[in-house]
Amino acid sequence: MLPRPKAPASPRRPQTPTPSEQDADPGPASPRDTEAQRLRFRQFQYHVASGPHLALGQLWTLCRQWLRPEARSKEQMLELLVLEQFLGALPSKMRTWVQSQGPRSCREAASLVEDLTQMCQQEVLVSLDSVEPQDWSFGEEEDGKSPRSQKEPSQASELILDAVAAAPALPEESEWLETTQLQQSLHTRAEAEAPRAPGLLGSRARLPLKPSIWDEPEDLLAGPSSDLRAEGTVISSPKGPSAQRISPRRRNRNTDQSGRHQPSLKHTKGGTQEAVAGISVVPRGPRGGRPFQCADCGMVFTWVTHFIEHQKTHREEGPFPCPECGKVFLHNSVLTEHGKIHLLEPPRKKAPRSKGPRESVPPRDGAQGPVAPRSPKRPFQCSVCGKAFPWMVHLIDHQKLHTAHGHM
């Protein structure tokens, strides 16, 4: 009988590696890789996965990549967890510095924290030696010990942390001090140049710029350019119809400390003017008053634009006779004001009419009486009877008589 052939020996281990063998890393992991794997595990978010089971699978994989149970013992994995908790309990700035050194164990992390504390303490002691004693002593002590020697360990650690936290803020404080000094110097320079402001305003007033309608009257006034008169004097021209008086209250406001009145600006023909041509400004009163007054006719204006338009009428000089009364005026604006007197003159009183059947009837054609000739003083003439009247209202009342009797 032939011997039975032996079956081929099956492999002791499968050809495909297990998941644990896939994740295993024969070489030791560097601190940077361990920290990166820890962050991926701690910062995992649920919405990245498509479901709860997939999220648990990813967390399981990330945790194995971080702790590596196939390459580390239980004590090593516990040390990683304790190291993470220890670093999380440190202050933020100290934790950042210790993590940058890459400690592999809790003892290394504790040594780094101790070294950092000693370095900061030495820096604080050096800074305390440079400070004057009176800044730290609040009184004379009998034992003669310095305040630094009486500090407890907890207070020293607080000083160390304060020094570490205040270190990056020093450049910002120095920049702030430089900015403050610059602002103070600019403010001092502005105060020194303040007396030159009136001169600048005066030179600006000579420019032929049209002022804005939004400017307030008080903003357009120049301090020394106001026309100040004595108490009870009239601010108007000899021929002007309007006049205003300055009250003693306003007069006292415009006197200087020595009690003298400031000189007024006068309008000169063809010459250089210190302010607007022909301006005589009333002393500044309460808000909403009329500060602009014409020196030629005495008219007062609230806005400078109206005042400038009024000044144009004074440039046309010459004899202007009144067509009504024959008076002659030097300026056209004065003639315009004078003409209002004739236009607003009240009409003459009419004789009372007799109410009754025997009302006066105008004469018929061929029996008219003498008709008053038309003259410049009687420009309004009736087209029915030929009578002339000096006022339009008289002619209208006269024409009502013809209308009542059917002659029109």
UniProtKB/Swiss-Prot annotation:
Name residues in a coiled coil. Answer: none
Q: Where is the composition biased (Polar residues)?
A: 177-187
**Zn finger residue spans: C2H2-type:** 292-314, 320-342, 380-402
Keywords associated with the record: DNA-binding, Metal-binding, Nucleus, Repeat, Transcription, Transcription regulation, Zinc, Zinc-finger
One Gene Ontology molecular-function label: RNA polymerase II cis-regulatory region sequence-specific DNA binding
The answer on whether this UniProt entry bears the keyword Transcription reads yes
Q: Where in the cell is it found?
A: Nucleus
> Boundaries of each SCAN box domain copy?
38-120
Q: Which InterPro entries match?
A: SCAN-C2H2_zinc_finger, SCAN_dom, SCAN_sf, Znf_C2H2_sf, Znf_C2H2_type
Determine if Nucleus is one of this entry's keywords. yes
Which CDD domains does the entry link to? SCAN
Gene Ontology biological process terms, A to Z: regulation of transcription by RNA polymerase II
Start and end residues of each stretch annotated as Disordered: 1-34, 136-155, 177-203, 215-273, 344-379
Q: Extract one GO cellular component term from the record.
A: chromatin
Q: Which SUPFAM superfamilies match?
A: beta-beta-alpha zinc fingers, Retrovirus capsid dimerization domain-like
| Pfam families xref list | SCAN (PF02023), zf-C2H2 (PF00096)
Per the entry, what this protein does is: May be involved in transcriptional regulation.
* Protein name, per record: Zinc finger and SCAN domain-containing protein 1
